[in-house]
UniProtKB/Swiss-Prot annotation:
The keyword Aminoacyl-tRNA synthetase does not apply. It is an enzyme of class 2 (transferase). Keywords: Acyltransferase, Amino-acid biosynthesis, Cytoplasm, Diaminopimelate biosynthesis, Lysine biosynthesis, Repeat, Transferase. This is 2,3,4,5-tetrahydropyridine-2,6-dicarboxylate N-succinyltransferase. Homotrimer. GO terms for biological process: diaminopimelate biosynthetic process; lysine biosynthetic process via diaminopimelate. One of its GO terms (cellular component) is cytoplasm. GO terms for molecular function: 2,3,4,5-tetrahydropyridine-2,6-dicarboxylate N-succinyltransferase activity; nucleotidyltransferase activity. The keyword Ribosomal protein does not apply. It catalyses: (S)-2,3,4,5-tetrahydrodipicolinate + succinyl-CoA + H2O = (S)-2-succinylamino-6-oxoheptanedioate + CoA. Belongs to the transferase hexapeptide repeat family. Substrate binds at R111, D148. NCBIfam families: dapD, PRK11830.1.
Amino acid sequence: MSATDLASLEKIIEAAFDNRDNVNTSTKGEVRDAVESALDLLDAGKARVAERSSDGAWTVNQWLKKAVLLSFRLNDMDVVKGGSGNSTWWDKVPSKFENWGENHFRAAGFRAVPNCVVRRSAYIAPNAILMPSFVNLGAYVGEGTMVDTWATVGSCAQIGKHVHLSGGVGIGGVLEPMQAGPTIIEDNCFIGARSEVVEGCIIREGSVLGMGVFIGKSTKIVDRATGEVTYGEVPPYSVVVAGSMPSGNATMGNGQPAPHLYCAVIVKRVDEKTRSKTGINELLRD
């Protein structure tokens, strides 16, 4: 699709979103066609909710998020087939795999293990592996990435190439508020079991999160080497574990010292060469 065509789609969707109170299941014509085209672009990986520039900055295509939101107004509830024992679900978003056969899967080039759930408009790149997991609408999963058992990739989340999302990992989705950016895991990251990255935080390339690390916008990210405290972004090639920080001189009502509070700790930085040659368990040993 040409830049002119994309600009035309964006214009229609922006206008429809501004007038969204009048968009419903009866809406036909260019609004419905534009939303369907936008969802098809997302589903095929030809458009992304967020894109990384050469300087590392991420640009959010808000109009694509708006297209996803408009689809909820346009689509009525319907039966979704495919449950165990011929059971069904009741939803507005069909499966990405609806009506797929062998040819579709071979062309797509990724593995979809039984009981994984991928909603329409999520893109899964070739050589990715989906264990029984959940990938929400508008998300992007890069080439060679493993989404392990019970991991969740939230709406519009961006997962890079050769990422490992371990068992039970949660990557938060962001559709609203509209100005919020999606949660982003860049290329070659390892996210340890049961960790959570949410609220539009960014884990930069090559980073390793140990098991049970939780990072949201208000989470303190502490560099052990420097004492620097940052929020919302883990630098490239960082090794991060769960930790805690003292509450200063604060005391509780009973006069006892206040409890330490959770933080994420950058215990070391590694270069790309070391990261590629060193086992994850070895990196996490202190």
